[in-house]
Amino acid sequence: MAAINIRLSKNFTTQLNKLNEKYGEEFARLNGLSDGELSYTDFIDNFVDTETVADASIDSSSNVSTKHMNTLLNEMPKPHRKLLCLHKIYYEINKKYGFKTANEWLEKEWTRALYMHDADTATFKHYCFAYDLKDLAEKGLFFLENFGYEPAQHYTTFIDFVKEYISFAANLSSGAVGLPNLIPYMFYFWKKDCDEHYLGITEEYFEKYARQGVQRFVFAVNQPYVRDGIQSAFTNVSIFDGEYLEALFGGAEFPDGTFMVDYLDEIKEFQKLFMEEEAKIRNTNMFTFPVYSLSLLRKNGRFVDEEFAEWGIKQICIVNKINEKNQISGWYDSNFFIDDSVTSLSNCCRLKSNIDDLGYFNSIGGTALKVGSVKVSTINLARLALEHPKDEKGYLVALRDTVELDCKALDIVRNIIKRDVEKGLLPNFSKGLVDFEHLYNTIGFIGIYETMKTFGYVEVDDFGNSFYTEKADAFGKKIFQVIHNAKESFALDKDYKINCEQIPGESAAAKLKRADEMLFEDTVVKDLPLYGNQFIPLGIKTSLQERIRIASLFDSYCNGGSICHINIDAPFDSFEKAWDMVNYIADQGLTYFAFNAKISSCKHNHSFYGNTCPVCGLPKSREWSRIVGYYTATDTWSADRKDEYEMREWENVNG
């Protein structure tokens, strides 16, 4: 049978052939574009033979945990889609910025000096967004074609509408679906049903009715077919203290014209109910989503809403028996976002949005929580260190040029997505769920630790703990200043903003490290099997104080998001210890962090700590931990991530 050809531009084909010849088959495989991956028959054979989907995919995610025919059909065309996306970006860069720039970008992308995330959908879908559910609450399923929509009238109907909304949004994007105002609207519809005694509901049943709605939501978003028929939707839910609630929703109205501000205390209590019920569910089913962010305002060394802060820390960090079935709370399943201003919030995985920056506040308090990213393209900082060892000036000049090139690539991707919208191919935009006004272009980075190690700016004490030197602190600030200056200069004549993110790098971290091993075998930092997605990677031994210090030092530069994960070998054994730890971290100026635990599950998927299930008595069969930003079973991780997990350091917080 004749070969099946894909029509691509001559310039792109010529350049790709040159890169193949220059860098060899290993780099083609690293890009997911080797002959074996582009061959459907070879891909099928490899898919069947590998242990996990993550090891077979060219763009792995531990959220895709089950090998079945739908997974195969979804993963198989990824290499071809990626090829088409790279071609389109190259073609458009060539048109706008010139042939030399297009070739430079493609070579850096090919050699993993740059890394376009979700590359197989880079020219088809945007990345992530935090959605405002106001239109859904007031109109119903307004985004569906040929569908006579009307607003929900009841609690259960609204939750079902949210499920459809998430599915619609998730399948037309490649990243997280943030839901900052989900709970206020759930409260509204629940209260409406209670006030009207819907279906004869009496007061003693009100709480149970509320909890059933939470169950309905949590089970739905964790079904493994919501996105692309192969995985659950990456959903984020925001939990706010009283100060955040008032600032964000003080001027908002519910569908019946009542003001949210009149119900803030009740909404706060509904948030508690939501998290308490989700914790109860986790006992019988170890679920991944939603990922929570608990937003707390802190001024002058204390939490402004101290009662809510105390409740949140107890709920997240303290293992408490909640019923006679030996079920517990305290799953460490929420990120902490602690700031001295309500103009920022965290959603969409690591995305930190400055509400003032994008004009989210209106004169009566503001409710437009919409914020997201068109796409993320990451700079391999470790590569620059290998190319310019111990030459700060050379490093920073090369970094400036790389940032500018990255901005050009992201600019092209943004314009391609815009044209997709104009062609009517992205109804999530045309129906108003997402808009470009609230979408950043995001520059990612990885490899800060490896940069400092290459420059000799990391010291190790007699106990084996690694510390950044004063030179590392100063050089790190210079790196981020160059990134910000370069991106701000590029954006001067643009109608959008560019932000900066320390990427999770679930699969990118290993690919970038592998590329550097092939190009710089003798000088690459070999401390870990992949590059760290923390300022001091979780597999590097250091003191807790140093980990927090460095994260706090660099955190403010990451307006696109950064989170410090603090691995703990066992849950806090007292509230006082957890309270003191959270306050200590906040006092160091670290705004976004999470405690990361090891959670066990038995064959019935009951969750617990230790080796024996307290619910059914069966032994531990799986272990769960944050692979990057969310809990998944470690046996679904790629081989590189499993190796990294074995090297992670765990803090004793009870000593």
Residue locations for each model-derived region?
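Contiguous, well-ordered alpha-helical segments that form the cores/surfaces of helical PPI scaffolds
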Residues: 184, 441-454, 626
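Glycine-centered flexibility sites
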Residues: 444-447, 560, 629, 640
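Short, surface-exposed acidic
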Residues: 460-463, 634-636
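Conserved catalytic cores of very large enzyme subunits
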Residues: 3-437, 458, 464-469, 473-614, ...
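Metallocofactor- and cofactor-centric catalytic cores in central/energy metabolism, strongly enriched
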Residues: 208-219, 453-454, 632, 641, ...
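Long, charge-rich boundary regions
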Residues: 617-655
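Core of folded catalytic or high-affinity ligand/protein-binding domains
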Residues: 436-445, 642
